[in-house]
């Protein structure tokens, strides 16, 4: 049985995490599946969280510490699961690092080299929404905007909602550029209801997953 690597990308509030979970639940009825999230390495997660809280990361340190998290999960979980024939779903992949690091003025080619060890996903679903829609969803969920979601480390101390719109707009610009360059990127209109987005994703994957059993 062949392993399959699926990644979800998008700005905060895009609904990509919800789509990843919905897809996992659907695939579980067909074959083994594993879901991994960005910044979820057991031994470095708390370090990253504390460093962000204290706003003590330079642009390069920001890049390297997230690469450490990814490489740990990649070697201990992602690759072994793929070799065992699992469908591996990544809630954020290396493209998150590309976008967030470049926004912080880290050289794009340098970041790509940093993650050059990582294989390309079979499918990367870019759940594209406007920052305004993402912000409205966060409001409806009554969730507080995290300082890092508002880019306070690069924009300074401005109102969180204002920072969110500015920062996420920059992220969208980079994602759009990546989507044009990466052949495995599938741009999905995420401004629609979650159910409609998930239907489109399943239509794309259904036959491929069944044929890879």
Swiss-Prot record:
Lineage: Archaea, Thermoproteota, Thermoprotei, Sulfolobales, Sulfolobaceae
Gene: tmk2
One GO MF term: dTMP kinase activity
GO annotations of cellular component type: cytoplasm
Entry's family note: Belongs to the thymidylate kinase family.
Pfam family, one: Thymidylate_kin
GO terms (BP aspect): dTDP biosynthetic process; dTTP biosynthetic process; dUDP biosynthetic process
Binding site for ATP: 10-17
Transmembrane segments: none
Annotated EC: 2.7.4.9
Keywords: ATP-binding, Kinase, Nucleotide biosynthesis, Nucleotide-binding, Transferase
Enzymatic reactions: dTMP + ATP = dTDP + ADP
Protein name: Probable thymidylate kinase 2
């Amino acid at each position: 049985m062949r392993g399959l690597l699926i990644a979800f990308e998008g700005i905060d509030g895009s609904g990509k995490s919800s789509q990843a979970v919905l897809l996992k639940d659907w695939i579980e009825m067909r074959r083994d599946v594993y879901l991994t999230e960005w910044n979820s390495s057991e031994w470095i997660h708390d370090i990253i969280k504390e460093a962000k809280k204290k706003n003590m990361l330079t642009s390069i340190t920001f890049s390297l510490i997230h690469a450490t998290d990814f490489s740990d999960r990649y070697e201990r979980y992602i690759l072994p699961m793929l070799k065992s024939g699992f469908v591996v779903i990544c809630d954020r992949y290396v493209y998150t690092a590309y976008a967030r690091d470049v926004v912080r003025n880290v050289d794009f080619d340098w970041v790509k080299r940093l993650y050059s060890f990582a294989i390309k996903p079979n499918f990367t679903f870019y759940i594209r929404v406007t920052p305004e829609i993402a912000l409205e969803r966060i409001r409806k969920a009554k969730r507080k905007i995290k300082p890092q979601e508002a880019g306070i480390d690069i924009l300074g101390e401005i109102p969180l909602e204002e920072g969110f719109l500015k920062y996420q707009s920059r992220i969208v610009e980079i994602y759009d550029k990546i989507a044009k360059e990466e052949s495995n990127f599938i741009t999905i209109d995420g401004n629609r209801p979650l159910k409609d987005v998930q239907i489109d994703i399943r239509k794309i994957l259904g036959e491929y997953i069944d044929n890879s059993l």
